[in-house]
């Protein structure tokens, strides 16, 4: 387990418990279970205390944890018959974006998501989840396909933001993000988005302009990273804690503001401590949201989605 900086006291306690058990395995007849169990209880109590009231900055740290389940994990666990589509039919295939046809609970769907990678090699291959223009254009292809065949769209958002490189800008990064956002508003099928980690800026909005937006309990969604905000406003990236507070980027704040429709509970200690339980909770939330659409027709879906976003900001700002 990789520990975050605020989890260091927890790391020490869990480390001591593991050391005791390792000693018992090496030395036959040594009984340490009572001592180890006491340390386990102490660690569980501390974990509960640490996660009872996380600050926005600490939630950012949890949302970025490298061991949280990623898009690939959710697709493998929740979807069957997944058939990926590649390329934007124009320039290249962007590996930061996964997407294809699949079945969810036997319902044919299109699933699209950001994939950050799980080790050095795959993180480089996936560009750390930062999509280039061809990634957003691939997503538009998939949404067009879903619209044509009347398939619900499910997006899984986990990105620090769209890739800001020179080549991406030359190939029309801002236009590609805008087209993807526009396509979200145009398709006449149910569109569900789940923020599973980071929801960074326009790179996230391009997939999250949905009928229903769900966020994992410790995920974040913001126009800019706390570090970027602090650098611009205070010329000091070290003020990221103050920036995180001001940005109102947590799932709980965004639910109060009406941006987030559903907050999905995570296992104690975050999704990284129990991936299977976190994935199961997301699956149940998606199933519930899909069932809520009933027999809504194309015109109703498009009108309702547009109204939802036009109404943002009209309520909840005083919360």
From Swiss-Prot:
One Pfam family recorded for the sequence: ACCA
Pathway listed: Lipid metabolism; malonyl-CoA biosynthesis; malonyl-CoA from acetyl-CoA: step 1/1
Keyword Nucleotide-binding applies: yes
GO cellular component: acetyl-CoA carboxylase complex
Compartments (UniProt record): Cytoplasm
EC supergroup of this enzyme: transferase
EC number: 2.1.3.15
Keywords of this entry: ATP-binding, Cytoplasm, Fatty acid biosynthesis, Fatty acid metabolism, Lipid biosynthesis, Lipid metabolism, Nucleotide-binding, Transferase
Reactions catalysed according to its record: N(6)-carboxybiotinyl-L-lysyl-[protein] + acetyl-CoA = N(6)-biotinyl-L-lysyl-[protein] + malonyl-CoA
Keyword Lipid metabolism: yes
Family: Belongs to the AccA family.
Function field: Component of the acetyl coenzyme A carboxylase (ACC) complex. First, biotin carboxylase catalyzes the carboxylation of biotin on its carrier protein (BCCP) and then the CO(2) group is transferred by the carboxyltransferase to acetyl-CoA to form malonyl-CoA.
Protein's UniProt name: Acetyl-coenzyme A carboxylase carboxyl transferase subunit alpha
Organism of this sequence: Jannaschia sp. (strain CCS1)
